[in-house]
C-alpha cells in the first residue's frame, strides 16, 4: 500500500443520471433554485450539464447515461446543506417536490434531515447545517 498522497484535493462534481436533461434542468434550476454552471455538447450525442446551489464549490452533473445503463432511480448519496431544514422541507413540498412526509430527527450527533426525489426518482438528502 502506498503512503504517498495523490494530488486530489476536493470533490468537484458528482454525476446524477437522468432520462431528460431539459426536464432535469427545469427541476434543479427552476424548482430548487440552483444555478446552471455548464451546458455544452459532450461527444456526438450528449451534453455536459452542471448545476449547483449559488455558493457551492461542488457541482452536480445531470447526465444521460450511456445506452444500457439506468437513467435515474438511484440513491445518490448527495447531502445538501440547509440553514433551516424545516423551512426548506415545507418550501419544497409546496413546490410539488416529492419529499419525505416529515423531517427526520434522530438525535445527536445526527442533524435534522429529509430526503427528496427528482423527476427521475433519484434520491437526495437535505441536512441542517451546524
Segment roles from a protein language model:
Residues 2-7, 13-16, 39-40, 47, ...:
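Vicinal oxygen chelate
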Residues 8-9, 15-58:
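Core segments of cupin and vicinal oxygen chelate
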Residues 20-21, 82-85:
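Helix N-cap motif at beta-to-alpha junctions
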Residues 27, 86-91:
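Short amphipathic alpha-helices within nucleic acid-binding modules
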Residues 40-42, 54, 67-68, 104-106:
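Short polar/acidic secondary-structure junctions
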Residues 54-58, 67-69, 85-87:
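Short, charged/polar surface micro-motifs in flexible loops or helix N-caps
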Residues 55-60, 121-124:
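Short, charged/polar, Gly/Pro-enriched secondary-structure boundary elements
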Amino acid at each position: 500500500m502506498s503512503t504517498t498522497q495523490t494530488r486530489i484535493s476536493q470533490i468537484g462534481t458528482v454525476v446524477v443520471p437522468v432520462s431528460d436533461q431539459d426536464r432535469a434542468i427545469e427541476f434543479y434550476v427552476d424548482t430548487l433554485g440552483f444555478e446552471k454552471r455548464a451546458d455544452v455538447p459532450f461527444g456526438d450525442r450528449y451534453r455536459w450539464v452542471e448545476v449547483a446551489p449559488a455558493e457551492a464549490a461542488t457541482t452536480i452533473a445531470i447526465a444521460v447515461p450511456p445506452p444500457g445503463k439506468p437513467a435515474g432511480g438511484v440513491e445518490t448519496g448527495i447531502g445538501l446543506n440547509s440553514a433551516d431544514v424545516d423551512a426548506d422541507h415545507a418550501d419544497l413540498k409546496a413546490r410539488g417536490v416529492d419529499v419525505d412526509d416529515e423531517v427526520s430527527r434522530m438525535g445527536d450527533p445526527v442533524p435534522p434531515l429529509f430526503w427528496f426525489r427528482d423527476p427521475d426518482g433519484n434520491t437526495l438528502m437535505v441536512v441542517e447545517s451546524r
